[in-house]
Amino acid sequence: LGDVYKRQEVYERVGELLSRYKSGPLPKAFKIIPSLPAWEDIVYITNPEMWTPHATLAATRIFVSNLKPAQCERFYQLVLLDKIRDEIRENKKVSYQMYEAIKKSIYKPAAFFKGILFPLCDGGGVTLKEAAIIGSVIAKVSIPVLHSAAALLRLAEMEYTGPTSLFIRILLDKKYALPYKTIDALVYHFLQFADKSRGVEVTRTRAGVVGERRMPVLWHQSLLVFAQRYKSDLTPDQKSALLDLIRVQRHAGIEPEIRRELSTGESRGEMLPEPLEEDDDMSI
């Protein structure tokens, strides 16, 4: 029992240091936390809510380097995600140290998506400011294609929000070769709004009269990037359905570009024309 109290006291002191930490070596007692069986409880004793951004970055580096993906996911859910959101809520931005912590967290991509991105998007509570900041990090960091494909599949199946469109556009802009399962899920994601009544924004006249429903600009932008990057992976039927879609969900500036992309190029399953055999008499 004495050891328990002693450990409690040690990690409370470590927590006090982390609440003031700016630079320099961290206590050895903190560095060994990832190797302890009850590491989650130990982290809790250090009171992560009070960690400085510098301490959060240092801790993220230690945990990413020493924990397995499933454990990293827990650290992201229990500590890092809340630290990110609290800083954005208080300052409307993140510090350099927190930005670097987000970047470091993507070194374990499965843990990042399951511990930060999906919890952020689930339930529709993510703000556009949060999405813009985290999305800018995703855009700068290389992510393995299989993890990106799985993330796009999950995002496509989530309840729609504007930030979801932003994350989809950023991942599509990486131009990875995606499996058809992910392509098909994205097609369905867009086609679920082929009924105008499914639009998430409501237009109003100058007099305040409620008009028709429509999809936001972020949605049109993500559809345009999808058409630009993956039109050759779409079947003719999928292209036709998406062309019908933009006749319902219109946007004067973006719709013509989407139509042009979907109306050009090859389609999935189409045979390429065979090259003509050179006449023997013409060969040199």
What does each model-identified segment do?
Residues 2-5:
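Short, small-residue-biased leader/transition segments that mark boundaries at the very start
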Residues 9-12, 50-58, 71, 89, ...:
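Residues within HEAT/ARM-like alpha-solenoid scaffolds
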Residues 28-111:
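Surface-facing alpha-helical segments and adjacent helix-coil boundary elements at the starts of domains
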Residues 57, 61, 132, 136, ...:
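Residue-level signature of alpha-solenoid helical repeat scaffolds
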Residues 72-77, 95, 110-114, 148-149, ...:
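Core helices of alpha-solenoid repeat scaffolds
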Residues 74-174:
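Amphipathic alpha-helical interface segments within eukaryotic helical scaffold
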Residues 154-191, 195, 199-203, 209-214, ...:
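Alpha-helical protein-protein interaction/assembly modules
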Residues 192-284:
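Eukaryotic acidic, Ser/Thr-rich intrinsically disordered low-complexity regions
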